[in-house]
Amino acid sequence: MTVSFLRIEIQNCSAGILRFLPRNPDLFAAIKPSSALASLYSTVSGQIEENPKRYEHHNVATCIATLQRCAQRKDYVSGQQIHGFMVRKGFLDDSPRAGTSLVNMYAKCGLMRRAVLVFGGSERDVFGYNALISGFVVNGSPLDAMETYREMRANGILPDKYTFPSLLKGSDAMELSDVKKVHGLAFKLGFDSDCYVGSGLVTSYSKFMSVEDAQKVFDELPDRDDSVLWNALVNGYSQIFRFEDALLVFSKMREEGVGVSRHTITSVLSAFTVSGDIDNGRSIHGLAVKTGSGSDIVVSNALIDMYGKSKWLEEANSIFEAMDERDLFTWNSVLCVHDYCGDHDGTLALFERMLCSGIRPDIVTLTTVLPTCGRLASLRQGREIHGYMIVSGLLNRKSSNEFIHNSLMDMYVKCGDLRDARMVFDSMRVKDSASWNIMINGYGVQSCGELALDMFSCMCRAGVKPDEITFVGLLQACSHSGFLNEGRNFLAQMETVYNILPTSDHYACVIDMLGRADKLEEAYELAISKPICDNPVVWRSILSSCRLHGNKDLALVAGKRLHELEPEHCGGYVLMSNVYVEAGKYEEVLDVRDAMRQQNVKKTPGCSWIVLKNGVHTFFTGNQTHPEFKSIHDWLSLVISHMHGHEYMTVDD
């Protein structure tokens, strides 16, 4: 029975709908809840007064058609006027479709509360429920859509073929078991062979990585001309790293003449990105250009990501520069590419361009740029980013996002600013093991051994379990601060107390600690007693300690083993050369350099940098490409001349 919209009371609404209505406890008990609908009626009635003759000749069918146009255009103002007109004419009592059209209009305009209120005053049928379910999904409330569907079933109303596609679009709020139940009912009602229902099922199963179920639904569909079906299946296989199956589906799609859309292109590109198949990825790039999808922003973003993951920086940049439109994802992708390829200066330069373009950075942007500031020791830019995070509200004491705090803290540590790093650490509401490890490692590298050990004690008291990285930081702290006994104890406690098996990194720290303390024989014995220690890092550490303490005999042993492990690396040659120089054996120095030439080994050029107001200036040995090279060289020559005049000598002299 149709109930008058003006006389509807909330007790006629179901429990699922009630939660969307006002919850003022004082008013709720004192007045009839129908006031919520009366308020809406008052609003829409006022709209018609603006132009009382505008809808004078409208009948129910005309009003419904007009509401559909309002929904398409998201013109809720005109929709409200039609609503008011329909109320005054009594159309809502005469036609159930009128109420459904109103629900649909308000939902498409994003006014879900009004859609729910109108639904509460309309006759309950499958069309009204479909409009409400679709509205919740479109407006980002899939959980509410699922609850509405359950209420619909509880009221004995059977879904139709339009219910399932809308509901399945909100499968993010479901469990796999829910999808199977929906599938079972669709099969029972005979809708499982419908193209749109099938597409929704394939997509939903793929989201849950249940590709066998998705493939079964796909194979049983009589009509497979919809590219959405194929895209969902390609995505499903890609998500579980079955790239060959994904490409087989794509090949079959093309064989059957199904049109390739931008979603198809991005689905296949994602498969090639993860698998690292750059050659086939380039073929898809060509297909995108051929089909007119090459300039699409989503496709361009996927191409940047694919080329970047393969370290094809030039190609990724070329696509980026050719884009007419760039969104936040575009900028984040190209920033990640430059950072991944080691172009740290380029990363910061792009970040400046991003800010100038008016795009506001998000957490992803900042956690990409902050490590770059740390690698370049660009403290000024790191502090500017920190300030932006505070002003924009991305960083506050109530935030539970440890990752962004850890990135900020790590930047300060790498820039040598332990005071600000500790300030960020102390401001964190929740600290995970990474937070403690960053501070322990920071104190250790800066030779603040006591502070590192104090931090470890606080970590244990806070109930945070140390891990492998924690002990790397502790052993580094002991090495840099000369805490020999403490370092030995930590190595022993790793297995006995914390049940952590030491790795080559831990032994390398201990050997470095022993070498710095002139315990070279003990360091050597440890290195040869543990097969895990037979690596270049350990032998390079021993060789460096031999140079420090003038142990030429052990240096020869370490240098020989280092040469055997990495004959093409310059580090061992340089260390041996320095050992011979300090021992005054210049003929051996020449022999080492001859060996480097024969092996075609080149010394890695030295690098230094300085942070000025206009950015970071980097200098490499023998490189003359800096725009101010001549001026800098002239000033440097003048300084050296003054040094010689005061009887100082440079290192080269």
Swiss-Prot record:
MF terms in GO: RNA binding
UniProt entry tagged with the keyword Lipoprotein:
no
Q: Which domain of life is it from?
A: Eukaryota
**Region Type E motif: which residues?**
538-613
Keyword Secreted listed: no
Alphabetical keyword list: Repeat
- Pfam families, per the entry: E_motif, PPR, PPR_2
**Region annotated Type E(+) motif, chain positions:** 614-644
Q: Where are the PPR repeats?
A: 59-93, 95-119, 125-159, 160-193, 194-224, 226-260, 261-295, 296-326, 327-361, 362-396, 401-431, 432-466, 467-497, 503-537
Which residue windows are transmembrane per the record?
none
**GO BP terms:** RNA modification
Q: Which NCBIfam families match?
A: PPR
By sequence similarity, the record places it as follows: Belongs to the PPR family. PCMP-E subfamily.
* Protein name as annotated: Pentatricopeptide repeat-containing protein At3g14730
Organism listed in the record: Arabidopsis thaliana
